[in-house]
Regions:
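Negatively charged, low-complexity tracts enriched in Asp/Glu with abundant Ser/Thr
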Residues: 1-58
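A sequence-composition feature that detects small, non-aromatic residues
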Residues: 5, 9-12, 22, 47, ...
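Arginine residue identity/basic-tract feature
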Residues: 16, 41, 45, 51, ...
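Intrinsically disordered, low-complexity regulatory segments enriched in Ser/Thr/Pro
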Residues: 58-104
Length: 127
């Protein structure tokens, strides 16, 4: 079994350089061991270790049938679009869920979601 918190943080570090990331469960009583239904906050720090709260993300991982899906959004910024990643990426308005174009700073999030989903799909086949 993989440590999802480590996988998520490492993927965020790779795709959102030069920032460093930590993964915190949204609900204290939930762990980070299952991809069936996971909801975490990805906290961001700059190279000197200072918190970059406006760069923090929320990640939800869930299954739909046998498929793994991800929802990635900026924390406490409902006006920012959110990314759904299943077979393909879909950007949606954070306030109404309607489809929209990717934001100018969305490419690292798409890369992160794509890479993370590929790792989770690969791992779920091994389990």
């Amino acid at each position: 079994m993989i440590d999802l918190a480590v996988v998520i943080a490492h993927t965020a570090d790779l795709c959102r350089k030069p920032y460093q990331h930590a993964v915190i469960p949204i609900h204290e009583d939930e762990g980070t061991s299952s991809i069936d239904d996971l909801f975490v906050r990805i906290e961001t720090r700059d190279a000197s270790g200072s918190r970059m709260e406006d760069m923090d993300l929320e990640l939800e991982i869930y299954r739909s049938g046998s498929d793994v899906n991800l929802m990635l959004s900026w924390c406490d910024q409902a006006e920012r679009p959110m990314l759904w990643q299943g077979q393909h990426p879909v950007w949606m308005h954070g306030d109404n869920g309607m489809r929209c174009t990717a934001p100018a700073d969305g490419q690292p999030l798409e890369a992160m979601a794509r890479r993370l989903r590929a790792q989770l799909v690969s791992q779920s086949r091994l389990d």
